Amino acid sequence: MTLQQEIIQALGAKPHINPEEEIRRSVDFLKAYLKTYPFLKSLVLGISGGQDSTLAGKLSQMAIAELREETGDNALQFIAVRLPYGVQADEQDCQDAIAFIQPDRVLTVNIKGAVLASEQALREAGIELSDFVRGNEKARERMKAQYSIAGMTHGVVVGTDHAAEAITGFFTKYGDGGTDINPLHRLNKRQGKQLLAALGCPEHLYKKVPTADLEDDRPSLPDEAALGVTYDNIDDYLEGKTLDPAIAKTIEGWYVKTEHKRRLPITVFDDFWKR
């Protein structure tokens, strides 16, 4: 088995999908989890205004609405959380995403004060954060807020991770990567767009340039610029296509380098890191 085949198998990626079937698969998956643990009453997700959170949010709201109708349990709710750092540059996209999702409840938690307070506490301890590490601090603060909300609403935190993100480890460890349940796992980036198109999402929400927008020194840095490859390259790789060897090597390099992000904390029984 080649490394490409190994990666495709590990991430559950497929070269072709039926969008309607995958929508139903994700919604049923979320419903089944909540039905298995009936003490759970909410799904919680941060909404950024980008493709991934818009899709995960819509699927979550659909799951909650169906389950509420099927069970008669009106305590069930989907909570969309806005988590700006100060004022978000693409705030209108966030509002458009909320309008599309139609969540049961919307909360806004501005994380800037908490991030700055944490940075100051570290500074007083003699640690000065780099801009890159501060970006990770933002991602972790966002996740901390979501878990607090989930804890107070008997909920689980929904993730936005998908195959095209997982393969490169393009997420913050214990930040946006630290979630309870990931309904998009297996899909690549272009397949996520197909699901949103099938759901009637406004095109600008899934055709915009993807950006994590975590760094102050490089605001709105495109994901593709940070990775050195395009999402089309990554999707082609996940679909089993043959790529330019240099591009394939870059993608595989990211996969190997970030393997620790896709695993539980390393123990004496692990040897993947020796690869």
From Swiss-Prot:
**What InterPro entries does the record tag this protein with?**
NAD/GMP_synthase, NAD_synthase, NH(3)-dep_NAD(+)_synth, Rossmann-like_a/b/a_fold
**CDD domains given in the database record:** NAD_synthase
Q: In which pathway does it act?
A: Cofactor biosynthesis; NAD(+) biosynthesis; NAD(+) from deamido-NAD(+) (ammonia route): step 1/1
Enzyme kind, highest EC tier: ligase
An example molecular function term from Gene Ontology annotations: glutaminase activity
Please give an example of a GO cellular component term from this record: cytoplasm
Q: What is its EC number?
A: 6.3.1.5
Q: Where does ATP bind?
A: 46-53, 160, 189, 211
**Annotated PANTHER family:** NH 3 /GLUTAMINE-DEPENDENT NAD + SYNTHETASE (PTHR23090), NH(3)-DEPENDENT NAD(+) SYNTHETASE (PTHR23090:SF7)
Which family is this sequence assigned to? Belongs to the NAD synthetase family.
The task this protein performs is described as: Catalyzes the ATP-dependent amidation of deamido-NAD to form NAD. Uses ammonia as a nitrogen source.
Q: What is this protein called?
A: NH(3)-dependent NAD(+) synthetase
The organism named in the record is Salmonella typhimurium (strain LT2 / SGSC1412 / ATCC 700720)
Query: Gene encoding this chain?
Result: nadE
